[in-house]
């Protein structure tokens, strides 16, 4: 089973700040996907196949990486971006998720 380790577990960013969340895999993976979850809702697909934005995701989000190291970046933090972000990989037949990164607004 491939283990995904996210960093940081919790972070706070000021509005307009650049934010980067990393996801490290215990073995090389071909693709990494990201989900956004807000309080009281199910996780939504956010970035798929490393860098492709899901429908409706703002262009300030981007994804990158290869092998065992991947990241999600927000170029300029907005209030609506406060959420929990999860990385996810599918290594047939197992799907594994990271433990999540909680992104808060720094006030």
UniProtKB/Swiss-Prot annotation:
Protein name: Ig kappa chain V-VI region XRPC 24
GO CC terms: immunoglobulin complex
Disulfide bond annotation, renumbered to this chain: 23-87
InterPro entries: Ig-like_dom, Ig-like_dom_sf, Ig-like_fold, Ig_sub, Ig_V-set, IgV_Light_Chain
Region (Framework-1): 1-23
BP-aspect Gene Ontology terms: adaptive immune response; immune response
Other notes: This chain was isolated from a myeloma protein that bind galactan.
PANTHER family reported in the protein's UniProt record: IMMUNOGLOBULIN LIGHT CHAIN
Region (Complementarity-determining-3): 88-96
Matches recorded under Gene3D superfamilies: Immunoglobulins (2.60.40.10)
Region (Complementarity-determining-1) residue spans: 24-33
Region (Framework-4): 97-106
SUPFAM superfamilies: Immunoglobulin (SSF48726)
Region Framework-2: start-end pairs: 34-48
Organism expressing this protein natively: Mus musculus
Region of interest called Framework-3, as start-end residue ranges on this chain: 56-87
Residue ranges, annotated region (Complementarity-determining-2): 49-55
Protein keywords: Adaptive immunity, Disulfide bond, Immunity, Immunoglobulin
């Amino acid at each position: 089973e491939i283990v995904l380790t996210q960093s940081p577990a919790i972070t706070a960013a000021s509005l307009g700040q650049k934010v980067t969340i990393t996801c490290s895999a215990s073995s090389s993976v071909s693709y990494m996907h990201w989900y956004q979850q807000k309080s009281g809702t199910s996780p939504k697909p956010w970035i798929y196949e490393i860098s492709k934005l899901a429908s409706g995701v703002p262009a300030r989000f981007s994804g990158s990486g290869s092998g065992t190291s991947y990241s999600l970046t927000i170029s300029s933090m907005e209030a609506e971006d406060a959420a929990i972000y999860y990385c996810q990989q599918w290594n047939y037949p197992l799907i594994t998720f990271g433990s999540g990164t909680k992104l808060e607004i720094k006030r």
